[in-house]
Amino acid sequence: MGKYNLTALRVHQTALQQHAAGKIRAPPKWIDVVADIPPAQVLVRNQAAQHQLVRQRLKTVPGASKPQVAFEVQEKRIKSKKASRMFLPTEIKYEEDQLRREFFRDHPWELARPRVVVESSGRDFERYDWSRLQQPGKRLDGESVVQRQLWLLNNVPDMTRSAAYDIARREFYRLRLQEDIERRVAAEEAEATGATFGRSLLEVGMELENQQYERWKEWAKSEAQLQDQKTAAFVGAPEIAAHDEAVEPIEEKSALPL
């Protein structure tokens, strides 16, 4: 069959031949079952299944006493693919991906903050209650905003994506400001008890900027001197050129006949 490996399909035939040749004492116990239900012989490769994006929403229905849970399915557009990409696994998308992309596009510096990605048991998410943004045992980060926004979309009736984003973002800003105040107060209390701190990040950055500016000034002076030397090589020294221009009119006047 060329590139197809049919060894697994011939397991019943191989077992019978080995028993007849005396390689095995008794036929395997599964020999009758495989004879009745042989392995499937499918040589046609099917295309990968398309994954749909399912959203859970809580909506108020007219005439109903309580909001109803509704599931919205976003149909994925099927595009024509190349023959080499036809059987590749399809991309799996979740609603959190869009929320995460939107948040980090508006807050790119959140990606620069150190993050702890190690979990103690692998099931830490089961202890989190995203009805509030701050969770015990978890540092506040962009993922907290994403999960809080998703909880609002899934549990608050008629909640829109922009409104949930504004609510989660407002809570995030308030907690970030609280962390900054606590950090500043802790530093002031430590200084009051005799602690000394080094230079701040702003002071270090200003010093590096000043050093770079001084190096640039030295480079600019050397470049200016080099440019003047190149100009003097073609035209001559500036003071000599000015003296020659002043002498030429005098020589012209003396050359005129009396």
From Swiss-Prot:
Cellular component, GO, one term: mitochondrial small ribosomal subunit
Subcellular location as annotated: Mitochondrion
Subunit description: Component of the mitochondrial small ribosomal subunit.
Coiled-coil features, chain-numbered ranges: none
PANTHER family referenced in this protein's UniProt entry, alphabetically: 37S RIBOSOMAL PROTEIN S25, MITOCHONDRIAL, SMALL RIBOSOMAL SUBUNIT PROTEIN MS23
InterPro entries (alphabetical): Ribosomal_mS23_fun
Signal peptide start and end residues: none
Pfam families linked: MRP-S25
One MF term in the entry's GO annotations: structural constituent of ribosome
Protein name according to UniProt: Small ribosomal subunit protein mS23
Organism: Aspergillus clavatus (strain ATCC 1007 / CBS 513.65 / DSM 816 / NCTC 3887 / NRRL 1 / QM 1276 / 107)
The family this protein is said to belong to: Belongs to the mitochondrion-specific ribosomal protein mS23 family.
Keyword terms, alphabetized: Mitochondrion, Ribonucleoprotein, Ribosomal protein
Oxidoreductase listed as a keyword: no
Primary location group: mitochondrion
